[in-house]
Amino acid sequence: MQYLEGPVSFSRLQKFEGCPWSYYQKYVLKIEEHSGEIAELGKLQHGIIAEAIAQNCAPHADAFDAILEDIAAGELTYGKKDEKELAELWNKYSDHYEELKQRTIKALNLVGETQGEPILEKYFIKRLPCGVSLQGYIDFLIPGKKLWDWKTGHNYEKYINSPQLALNAWGTDELDAERAYVFL
């Protein structure tokens, strides 16, 4: 049996390293895992930030509220495929309004300091010499300039020595771009 079938991502490799049985159940047997609150809040936050950037949202509360109205109504400019899921997540986690707003405004302020046309949630897939493909998503990319990965938790140590950004840069041929985990 070959464990690493199909494309693998950094998070899949982490799962395999941490618990091969859990990896096998999820990616080989296709047994769904329930997402926890932290993962769901992270997905919601990433979706809000992507939508806010796509709509060229100003970094203030009124503009944030307008984005949330679109998300709650399932009417997204950017993340069409995620409309229903983000609306459901917002309905479930609307009590986290203040922290979602603060993180989004922080991200928008950082984006406002950049120059160039951003690409959001850039998917890549690159074949490795061993025959397996590496895949991933880049949260925020300005080709040749910036490669950012939004982090909504504060587990800094987990990422200090992580090869994730280097793998993402290599996978997208963006080796010269400034790479950063952006802790919101």
Task: Report residues per predicted region.
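Short acidic, Pro/Gly- and aromatic-enriched capping/linker segments at domain boundaries
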Residues: 1-12
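Generic recognition of stable, solvent-exposed alpha-helical segments in well-folded globular domains
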Residues: 8, 40, 44, 160-163
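Surface-exposed loop/turn and secondary-structure junction residues enriched for glycine/proline
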Residues: 11-16, 26-28, 34, 114, ...
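Mg2+/Mn2+-dependent nuclease catalytic core
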Residues: 118-184
